[in-house]
Curated annotation (Swiss-Prot):
It is found in: Nucleus; Cytoplasm. Pfam families: FAM212. Its main location: nucleus. Residues 289-316 are annotated as: Inka box 2. It comes from Xenopus laevis. Inhibitor of the serine/threonine-protein kinase pak4/pak5. Acts by binding pak4/pak5 in a substrate-like manner, inhibiting the protein kinase activity. Required for the proper migration of neural crest cells during embryonic development, probably by inhibiting pak4/pak5. The gene is inka1-a. Keywords: Cytoplasm, Nucleus. Residues 182-219 are annotated as: Inka box 1. One of its GO terms (molecular function) is protein kinase binding. GO terms for cellular component: cytoplasm; nucleus. InterPro entries: FAM212, Inka. This is PAK4-inhibitor inka1. Coiled coil: none annotated.
Length: 316
């Protein structure tokens, strides 16, 4: 059985290999046909015109120009520092040199702004060349600068106005907050111009205290209006409420005076209460019954003050 199974598998593999060989041969034939067709098309196509050759040659000539422009951007500052000495052409004036410096250096930073502007010019030129291939745009040669000692390079950049960034504007605004008549710090201005100048005192219920203090804050800063409102608040109360309030005040004042009078008339309490027993004596002169009676009197006493008995410390 195993032998028959192996024979069937080998036959199936051989048939698969033959199919793969046939498919590979057919693919090779198709590739050969495609190559022949391409060669025939290439031979039958007409030769290119000279105008097309010129348009194809334009991008190849622009590659070194772009490289030169990038190198000019990166080496602009280094050439200025080394004080390059080159003669200005007769048709170029210092004003055009200043305009050129403004064109190459308009932005927040001297390298990023010039690079971005140069890339935009390259994109515009490439689009124009793709639209009209016969026209070739060329930039005017960059005017050279004089020596730094003569002041030509520095004078060309004097008329340029650098725009302010957002951080500079914010910094000026923050500095302007504290510049007043009293010239306080901005933290002092913030604390003095706040709505509530009273100290915050929180009790057990902090949230309720916060809400109460917030509700008690005046809407306007004038204190005279607040006093008028407070006086009017008591005047608008009903007559019965005022009478009951005065009665409560009188009652409390009477209780306070009564307590003070009772304290003055009270007899000074002894440190050791009078228990109604005979004076204490040494232990061996008393009997057990007297000791038990004294202990019960001490337990039934309602005095909240400590009992200090220097003479009878041995009994207690």
């Amino acid at each position: 059985m195993r032998k028959l199974h192996l024979d069937s598998l080998t036959l199936q593999l051989r048939s698969d290999l033959q199919c793969i060989k046939a498919s590979s041969s057919s693919l090779c034939d198709q590739m050969d046909c495609m190559l022949r067709v391409l060669q025939d098309l290439k031979r039958s196509s007409p030769p290119p015109s000279p105008d097309i050759e010129k348009t194809c040659a334009v991008p190849q000539r622009r590659v070194p120009r772009r490289d030169n422009r990038i190198s000019h951007r990166t080496s602009d500052l280094s050439e200025a520092d080394s004080a390059c000495c080159m003669d200005l052409p007769s048709d170029v004036s210092p004003g055009s040199c200043g305009q050129r410096g403004l064109e190459w250096d308009s932005g927040y930073s001297e390298v990023s702004g010039s690079s971005l502007r140069g890339e935009e010019d390259d994109i515009v030129e490439e689009e124009s060349e793709t639209r009209a291939p016969a026209v070739v745009l060329r930039r005017l040669p960059t005017p050279s600068c004089q020596r730094l000692s003569s002041g030509g390079f520095l004078n060309s950049r004097q008329g340029r106005i650098r725009p302010k960034s957002t951080s500079d504007v914010c910094l000026e605004q923050w500095r302007g907050i504290g510049l007043g008549s009293d010239s306080q710090d901005w933290t002092g201005c913030l604390l003095s111009q706040s709505r509530s100048r009273q100290p915050l005192i929180l009790g057990d219920n902090s949230f309720a205290d916060l809400v109460k203090q917030w509700m008690d804050l005046p809407e306007n800063g004038d204190e005279e209006g607040r006093r008028v409102r407070d006086g009017g608040r008591w005047l608008h109360k009903p007559h019965g409420f005022l009478i009951s309030l005065s009665g409560n005040v009188k009652r409390r004042l009477g209780n306070m005076s009564r307590l003070r009078h009772s304290d003055q008339e009270a007899v000074k309490r002894m440190s050791c209460p009078q228990l109604g027993c005979r004076p204490l004596s040494p232990y061996y002169h008393q009997s057990l019954s007297d000791i038990a009676e004294a202990s019960t009197n001490l337990l039934n006493c309602r005095s909240r003050r400590p009992i200090i008995c220097n003479e009878g410390a041995g009994f207690l």
